Amino acid sequence: MVGILPLFVVLLIIVSFAMVVAVPVILATPGEWEKSQGIVWSGAGLWSALVILTGVFNAVPA
């Protein structure tokens, strides 16, 4: 259990960085929102799941 928490934190950092870079670019590019809407929503879902999983594994006693 000790090794999974740092993995979730690293994945959360990577997904957060990708979303911070990708979402403004997608929204600023004309016509790109219609093509990439599914990717943005999938990224948001993945980010939310990682936040919840990180919190759950942080709260579970070792």
Swiss-Prot record:
It holds the Pfam family Ycf9. PANTHER family: PHOTOSYSTEM II REACTION CENTER PROTEIN Z. One of its GO terms (biological process) is photosynthesis. The keyword Membrane applies. Belongs to the PsbZ family. The gene is psbZ. The chain crosses the membrane at residues 8-28, 41-61. It comes from Emiliania huxleyi. Keywords: Chloroplast, Membrane, Photosynthesis, Photosystem II, Plastid, Reaction center, Thylakoid, Transmembrane, Transmembrane helix. NCBIfam families: PS_II_psbZ (TIGR03043). It comes from the Eukaryota. This is Photosystem II reaction center protein Z. It is found in: Plastid, Chloroplast thylakoid membrane. PSII is composed of 1 copy each of membrane proteins PsbA, PsbB, PsbC, PsbD, PsbE, PsbF, PsbH, PsbI, PsbJ, PsbK, PsbL, PsbM, PsbT, PsbX, PsbY, PsbZ, Psb30/Ycf12, at least 3 peripheral proteins of the oxygen-evolving complex and a large number of cofactors. It forms dimeric complexes. GO terms for cellular component: chloroplast thylakoid membrane; photosystem II reaction center. May control the interaction of photosystem II (PSII) cores with the light-harvesting antenna, regulates electron flow through the 2 photosystem reaction centers. PSII is a light-driven water plastoquinone oxidoreductase, using light energy to abstract electrons from H(2)O, generating a proton gradient subsequently used for ATP formation. It is a multi-pass membrane protein. The keyword Thylakoid applies.
